[in-house]
Amino acid sequence: AGSVLMVIILIAEFIADLNTDRARASIRGLIGAVPTTARLRDGGDERIVPIAELQVGDVVLVRAGDSIPVDGVVVGGDGAADEASVTGESVPKDKAAGARVFAGTMLKSGALDVRTEAIGDDTTFAKIVALVEDAEDSRAPVQKLADKVATWLIPLIIVFLVVVFIVTRDVSMIVTLMIFTSPAELALATPMVIIAAIARAARSGILIKGGIYLESLARATTVVFDKTGTLTVGSPKVSAVRVVDGQLSEAELLRLAAGLDRRSSHPLAEAVVEYARAQGVDIPEPTDFEVVPGRGVTGTVDGRAVLVGNAALLTDAGIAVPTAEEATTVIHVAADGRLVGSIELEDQLRPGAKEAIAGLHANGVRRIAMLTGDNEAIARRVAADLGIDEVHADLLPQDKVAVIKEMRDRGERVAMVGDGINDAPALAVAETGIAMGAGGTQAAIEAADIALMTDDLSKIVGVRAIARRAYRTIQENLFVGVGVVHILGITAALLGWIGPIQAALIHLGPDILVFLNSTKLLTVRIKTGPDTTLQPLERN
C-alpha cells in the first residue's frame, strides 16, 4: 500500500510540473528563435558570420523567410516584416529605408539591408524574454497570502492529527487524513496561473512584469490616462497662425517661434518647426535657449528676447495674455516683453480610443480619468468625445503625481496609462503603471509595470481582461481545487469511508483541476470590445 501511495503522489507532482513546464515553454516560444548567424555585408561581398562577431554599425542582409538577427535600421531594400513576436500585431509591417526592425521577427517578403544597432542581450527581443522570465518568479499578494495560510495551517494540522489519533488509535485513518490535509496545493494554485497569464499576454505584445501587477490591475477601480500621445496620436498640426503685432508678418512670427522651437523636442515645438519649414521660412539658430518645464521655452532670436509657450509662461514674465480659452492648443509668442502673436494646433484622437474607454467601463472599471497639461476647454472636449468621467487639466508633471496620490488616498486602486517616458513619475506612483508603444524603447519598458509594445489602445482592455480572468482563476483553484475537495476528503476519512490508497487517488483531483483550469489561460482569445463584462476571455 505504501508503494502504491508513493507512486500516486509522484503522479500528482508530475502533473503539477507538467503544467508549469508547459506555461514556461509557451513563454520561451512566444517570441520565436533569433538566428545564431547573419549575412554580413563586407564591401561588395557578403559572408555568413556568427551573431557574436557582429558589431554596432555593421550592415546585414536579410532575405524573405529569414528571421531578422539584430535590432537596427533599414538602409536599403524594402519588404514586409511579421512583428507579431514583439508587438503582437499579426499584420506584416512594410519596411523601407529608415524603418526600424527587431531581432526575432520574420521578414515575409522582399530583402533588406539593416544597419545594426543592438546585438544579442541588448536587443528588444532579449530584454523582453528576460523581463518575462523574471516575472515568472514574482509573487502576487494572493500567493503570499496562500503561503502565509500554509505556514500557520501546518501546526494546526499536526494538532488535529494528534487529537484524532488519541481518540481513534487508527493509523490508517491518520495516513488518509495526512493526505487530505496537506497544504501543498495552496502553493500550486497561484504560480501556475500567473505564469500562464504572463505567457498569454506576452503573445499579444503585452509585457507584465510580475504577478503583483497582474493582481493590482485586476482589482483596479480607476484607470487614469495621459492625453497627449496616449488618447491622442501625439502628432499635433498647426491649424492657424494669428499675428497681433501689426509690425510683424506671419512668416516673421513663425521665424521667431520656430527659431526657439527647433531646439525643443516637445511634439508641439516639432509641429511648429515642421509648419514653418513647409511655409518656406528660414529658421535661425537661437542663443540663450532654456526650457521652462510645463511652460515652454525662452531664448534670443535675431537679437530679440523671445518666449514661446503657454499663457502661464508669459504671465510669469509679466506679459498680458487674453484669458479666453480655446478648444484648440494655443502657443503664445512674445518678443521684447510683449505679445506678438499665437499659433493654434490640433491633435487627432487615437483610433480605437472611444471603444477602449467603453471596453474598460464594461470590464468593471468604475471611473476613467484624464490628465493633461492642456487647458480646460480642450480637455473637456476630448473627454466628451471619448466618454471619460473625470478631467484634470492645466497640470504640470508634478501635478499629475499629486492627482494620482490624492486618488489613492481616497482608497481608489489606480492604474495609470502613459507613454512610459514623459509620464514616468505618474506611472511610478500609480498602483499599476502601463506604458503604451514600448516596442523598441527600453526606457519605456523599464518605466512601467506593464508595457504594451504597440499604440493599440484595445490592448489595455485585453490586459485588463487577462488580469481579471487570472485573478478569478486563482480564486477558483483555491476554492474548488483545494477547499471543496479537501473538505469532502477529510469528512470521508473521518467517517471511515476511504483509506490511504483511495485518498491518494482522490488527491489527484485538485492537481488535475488546477492544471486544467490554469492552462485555459494559454488558449483563450482576448475580446476587447464593450461586451467583455460577461466574458472577458473565451476559448478559440
Language model segments and positions:
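Helix-interface capping motifs at the ends of transmembrane segments in multi-pass membrane proteins
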Residues: A1, V149-T181, G205, F479-I506
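Actuator/coupling domain of P-type ATPases
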Residues: A1-T37, R41, Q55, V59-V60, ...
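Small-residue-enriched core segments of transmembrane alpha-helices in multipass membrane transport
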Residues: V7-L10, W152, M173-P191, A504-F515
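Juxtamembrane helix-loop transition segments at the membrane interface in multi-pass membrane proteins
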Residues: L18-A33, M192-G211, T519-L534
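Residue-level signature of catalytic and energy-coupling elements of molecular machines
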Residues: N19, A38, G57, G72, ...
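Conserved cytosolic catalytic loops of P-type ATPases
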Residues: G29-D122, I212-A257, T300, D389
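Cytosolic catalytic headpiece
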Residues: G43, I212-N422, A426-T432, A465-R468, ...
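Membrane-embedded alpha-helical bundles of multi-pass transporters
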Residues: L177, R200, G364-V365, L386, ...
